[in-house]
Structure formats: C-alpha cells, structure tokens
Design a protein with these regions (language model features):
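Short alpha-helical donor nucleotide-sugar binding micro-motif in glycosyltransferases
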Residues: 85-90
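A short helix/loop element that forms part of the nucleotide-sugar donor recognition site in Leloir-type
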Residues: 1-8
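Conserved acidic donor-binding segment of nucleotide-sugar-dependent glycosyltransferases
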Residues: 130-131, 135-142, 151-156
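Nucleotide-activated donor-binding/catalytic signature segment of Leloir-type glycosyltransferases, i.e.
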Residues: 47-51, 57-81
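Conserved donor-binding/catalytic core segment of Leloir-type glycosyltransferases
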Residues: 10-28, 34-38
Length: 197
C-alpha cells in the first residue's frame, strides 16, 4: 500500500499495469489491450468496482479515456525508485506486444513479483511460463488476452505466481546467472577448439 500511495494510485482494489516508452506505439499492442479490457469488463462487470489500470509511458493521456476501467495516466517516469513503486503497486502486468525479443519490462515486473500476461511472440513465451509466472495468450487474440487477465485476477494463486516470478528472474536473468551462462559457452568453445586442433 505504501508503494501505491507514493505514486498516487489507490490503496485498495486491484491494478493492471501497462508500460511502454510510448504507449501509442502500435507495436506495443495498445489496441489489443483496450479491446481485451473491454471484453474482460463485459464478461465480468463486477471488476469495474475494484479494478483499475495504471498506464506508464509517453502519451498516456491519449489512451486512458478509451479504457473500460478507471485508468491512471502516470506519464513518462525516469526515477528508478518511482518505477519500482509503480511495478510493486500492480497486481498484474500486461504487455500485448506484437514484436519483442526480450522485453525488459517483463523482467522488471517479474523481479518485483508481478505476474505477467503477454502474447505468444518473440521471446515473451520464454520469459512468461504459462500459468506459472503468468499467462501467454495466443498472438493477436484479444479474447485470449482477456482470459489470461481474468485468470491472473480471479483464478490463480497470485502469491504463488509472484514468488515464481521472482525465482525465475533470479534463476535466468540475474547478473550472476547470465555470467555463468557466458562461462559455460566459453568453456564449450575452448573444449571444441581442443577437439578440432
């Protein structure tokens, strides 16, 4: 709750987070996000009473009025502590990106224990373990994206998801784990060179 108060978000209720440097960038999938939120609210109108959306990035004011849930345009933020508080305020992070290799925002959200929902594209399915650290929706499928959001919000054990997210980041993306993988690759190359020579 302290994190939410620090960034001007409501202390009560659930918050869905969307982050992009420029939220109107077509590649980040805002149109699919808007459609999925609309579908989610139509299927579960009770969410209007206790769920809102926080939008972080440039041009947030251009999209918040189009969302079927109460939305908080946070604008562009560069202060790292504030960004961490924003992630910690969220109950779920949604990135319906249409093309992305290894989105830092998913890594950042997971490091803060926030379950993620995204499309099956690029490196996203490698980052989000389906129904373990979040939900991987079929590509460009707003209905499945809405299903994933509902699963995280109303069906999944969010505490277990959050713990799995933190573990995954520590295991796969920490500086130490990345360094160890480089060492393994170098050792394999050295062994291969000895074999060839």
């Amino acid at each position: 709750k302290a994190a939410r108060l620090n960034v001007g978000l409501p202390a009560e209720g659930r918050i869905i987070l969307f982050v992009s440097q420029k939220v109107t960038d077509e590649r980040k999938g805002m149109e699919y996000f808007i459609d999925a939120i609309d579908r989610l609210v139509k299927q579960h109108p009770e969410l209007k009473d206790n769920t809102s959306v926080a939008v972080l990035g440039g041009n947030t004011q251009l999209v918040c009025d189009r969302l079927a849930l109460k939305a908080y345009p946070l604008g562009y933020v560069s202060d790292e502590r504030r960004i961490v508080d924003i992630y910690r305020s969220a109950d779920m992070y949604v990135l319906p990106s249409l093309e992305d290799n290894l989105p830092n925002t998913i890594m950042e959200a997971m490091a803060c224990g926030v379950p993620c929902v995204g499309f099956r594209v690029g490196g996203i399915p490698e980052m989000i373990e389906h129904r373990r650290t979040g939900y991987v929706a079929n590509f460009k499928d707003s209905a499945d994206l809405a299903t994933g959001m509902n699963w995280v919000l109303q069906e999944a054990d969010t505490e277990q998801l959050g713990s799995a997210c933190v573990s995954k980041v520590a295991r796969c993306y920490s500086g130490q784990s990345v360094a160890m993988r480089y060492i393994e690759v170098y050792n394999e190359l050295i062994a291969l060179k000895r074999y060839i020579v």
